[in-house]
Amino acid sequence: MCSEVTQHLTEDIIPFWKSLRDDENGGYTGFVGYDLKADRKAVKGCILNSRITWFFANAYTLLKDSSLLEEAAHGFAFLRDVCWDRTNGGVYWSVNHDKTPAETLKHTYNQAFSIYALSSYYEASGDREALDLAYQLYDIIEGRMRDGSGYREAFDEAFNEIGNDKLSENGVMASRTMNTL
C-alpha cells in the first residue's frame, strides 16, 4: 500500500499542483474549473498559497526531490513578497493575479496557515527568513488578535475587528469559532 500511495503522490498529486505554478506573477493559480482548466487571472487566496507551500515543503522532506523544495521556495517567495502586508504586518486574505491586494482583511485562520507554511518551509530549507516571518505572525496573533477570552478572528488591514463572515457557509456569524487556533 505504501508504494501505491507514493506512486499516486508522485505521478498524480505532485504534477497537478506543479502545473498550477505561475512563473509570471508568482504563487499558484487561484482557480481551476471542473474541466481542470486553470484561470490564470483568478484571484489568489493566500490560504491556498500557504497550503501549497506547506505541501511542497513537506513533500520535499519526505521524498528529498529537489524540485519539490524549489516549488516550496516559489510559494515562500510569493507569501513573503506578495501576500505579506508590508505596512501593517500579517498576510492578506487574497491578492489579484497581478500581485495587488484583492481583499486586505486579516483573518486569524489565514495567519495560522501561513505559520504552517513558513515553519514547514524553514524545516525543509533552513531559510531563517521563513522562520522569522513565522515568529512575526505568531506575535501578531498573540498581540493583536487575542483578547482576555481567546482569539478574535476577523480584522481589517490595520487589525481593527470586523465582522467574521469568511468561514461560515451556513450564515452563522460569530466573533469566535472552533475553526481557528
What are these regions (language model features)?
Residues 1-181:
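Glycan-recognition and catalytic cores of secretory/periplasmic carbohydrate-active enzymes
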